[in-house]
From Swiss-Prot:
Belongs to the importin alpha family. This is Importin subunit alpha-3. Keywords: Nucleus, Protein transport, Repeat, Transport. Coiled coil: none annotated. Forms a complex with importin subunit beta-1. Interacts with PRL1. Interacts with A.tumefaciens VirD2 and VirE2. GO terms for cellular component: cytoplasm; nucleus. SUPFAM superfamilies: ARM repeat. ARM repeats lie at residues 111-153, 154-198, 199-236, 237-281, 282-321, 322-364, 365-405, 406-447. It comes from the Eukaryota. It comes from Arabidopsis thaliana.
Length: 531
């Protein structure tokens, strides 16, 4: 395992249907959206381990002397084991100190060899030496590094009974011992949801939260925030009654100016908000939304990304919860993420967030329009990488599902038809369906405008779709393997183009042989050739 393993995330609640109401239209995030977090947090993990765990060498790499020292330490493992099993306290301290250094070497620390030597239960006993804090500290450090290994390594720590002792050490008089216990518990909890729940079942949350006070030094603050984040993460999520007490602390932590603290506090909030609406409400009531929106402008992606993820999770809630975000002026911040030079993953996440806002009511869709976001969303739909286009398509489609006729007319005026048509040939079934839904909603408005006499006898939006080569693409979807896509394509053609097809057929049947031939491109203006 790693100290900061990535969490799995749930799939979209609706796979092939753009909803006609806000509840169905909102989507929890997909697994691949979390890759940005996985990569960044693994980078943070390496930095944390190499700068905090190394007993020798510089942060920029090991020198030949360092490597020589590391090899000497490996050769001395049998002597360390003997010292640890001795009854002399000084020998125990010296051997445990060397063991900690051995487990802290930068490249390939011999964690398995140490575990196989059988010393772990003995080192765990040293954690209880309240009369000898130095030994407690060295033992805790060594065990922390073992817990940063594989799940099997972590399980050895658990089976040796270390977890409840680490929790007791959170009340130690030694700040160094407390900090090392915090780190160790973070490693154990970070291994898996099962390990996380075990740590929480021993009552670790309350003493962890007690570490956060005005006198806490920065290194402890960083480690404790990271451990708190691990207590909150994972699927299935921990019982909310165990993690909810962390919300007031997290509200204070997101006010920090320290990048590491902000990063892990925001990830913790993202985990707590990635759930049902009552959990989202608890996060809102903690008062974190205004600060999270401020952090959407943070210069560091490692802070911006989890802040954006949390805001995105909140707007998967109901309309009132979404409105809480809009009332704090989130839309200009989201527009900034679309318009400026942010990397693909951030633009994708911003589009996902916007798509859940456009799944709201007409007033919320209007707020998106008034913020100037539709223009940028259409630009993304035309020009961005496919993964970003996909989220933008959801944003436009949701807006056509819940928007008024005037709002849909505005989206058409911004050029959304052509890029929606272009995506009808993409290999992603969900995207094809989403675009078909959007085009159908647009055609309904075009038909209403025709019936009102605003566009003569023509559905202008049908003509625009034809001119964008969308009609041909929709026709081709009649042979699609996916039944949902086939049904939707047939429905659209039968609803909006049947009359033209019939008229064209009549023209063909009555045309003089010399003037009109089957398959000819000589179609009267306003007619559509299905040949």
């Amino acid at each position: 395992m790693s100290l900061r393993p990535s969490a799995k995330t749930e799939v979209r609640r609706n796979r092939y249907k753009v909803a006609v109401d806000a509840e169905e239209g909102r989507r929890r995030r997909e697994d691949n959206l979390v890759e940005i977090r996985k990569n960044k947090r693994e980078e943070n993990l390496q930095k944390k381990r190499f700068t905090s765990s190394m007993a020798f060498g510089s942060a920029t790499g090991q020198t030949e002397q360092d490597l020589s020292s590391a090899n000497q330490l490996k050769d001395n493992l049998p002597a360390m084991v003997a010292g640890i099993w001795s009854e002399d306290s000084n020998s125990q301290l010296e051997a445990t100190n060397l063991l900690r250094k051995l487990l802290s070497i930068e490249q390939n620390p011999p964690i398995n060899e140490v575990v196989q030597s059988g010393v772990v239960p003995r080192v765990v006993k040293f954690l209880s030496r309240d009369d000898f804090p130095k030994l407690q500290f060295e033992a805790a450090w060594a065990l922390t590094n073992i817990a940063s290994g594989t799940s099997e390594n972590t399980n050895v720590i658990i089976e040796s009974g270390a977890v409840p002792i680490f929790i007791q050490l959170l009340s130690s008089a030694s700040e160094d011992v407390r900090e090392q216990a915090v780190w160790a518990l973070g490693n154990v909890a970070g291994d898996s949801p099962k390990c996380r729940d075990l740590v929480l079942s021993y009552g670790a949350m309350t003493p962890l939260l007690s570490q956060f006070n005005e006198n806490t030094k920065l290194s402890m603050l960083r480690n404790a925030t990271w451990t708190l984040s691990n207590f909150c993460r994972g699927k299935p999520p921990p019982a909310f009654e165990q993690t909810q007490p962390a919300l007031p602390v997290l509200e204070r932590l997101v006010q920090s100016m320290d990048e590491e603290v902000l990063t892990d506090a925001c990830w913790a909030l993202s985990y707590l908000s990635d759930n049902s609406n009552d959990k989202i409400q608890a996060v809102i009531e903690a008062g974190v939304v205004p600060r999270l929106i401020q952090l959407l402008g943070h210069s560091s992606p490692s802070v911006l990304i989890p802040a954006l993820r949390t805001i995105g999770n909140i707007v998967t809630g109901d309309d009132l919860q979404t409105q809480m975000v809009l009332d704090q002026q989130a839309l200009p911040c989201l527009l900034n993420l679309l318009k400026n030079n942010y990397k693909k993953s951030i633009k994708k996440e911003a589009c996902w967030t916007i798509s859940n806002i456009t799944a709201g009511n007409a007033d919320q869709i209007q707020a998106v329009i008034d913020a100037g976001i539709i223009q940028s969303l259409v630009w993304v739909l035309q020009s961005a990488e496919f993964e970003v286009k996909k989220e933008a398509a959801w944003g436009i489609s949701n807006a056509t599902s819940g928007g008024t006729h005037d709002q849909i007319k505005f989206m058409v005026s911004q050029g959304c038809i052509k890029p929606l048509c272009d995506l009808l040939t993409c290999p992603d079934l969900k995207v094809v369906t989403v675009c078909l839904e959007a085009l159908e909603n647009i055609l309904v408005v075009g038909e209403a405008e025709k019936n009102l006499g605003h566009t003569g006898e023509d559905n202008l939006y049908a003509q625009m779709i034809d001119e964008a080569e969308g009609l041909e693409k929709i026709e081709n979807l009649q042979s699609h393997d996916n039944n949902d896509i086939y049904d939707k394509a047939v429905k659209i053609l039968e609803t909006f183009w049947t009359e033209d097809n019939e008229e064209e057929g009549n023209d063909e049947n009555h045309a003089p042989q010399s003037g009109f031939q089957f398959g000819s491109t000589n179609v009267p203006p306003g007619q559509f050739n299905f040949i």
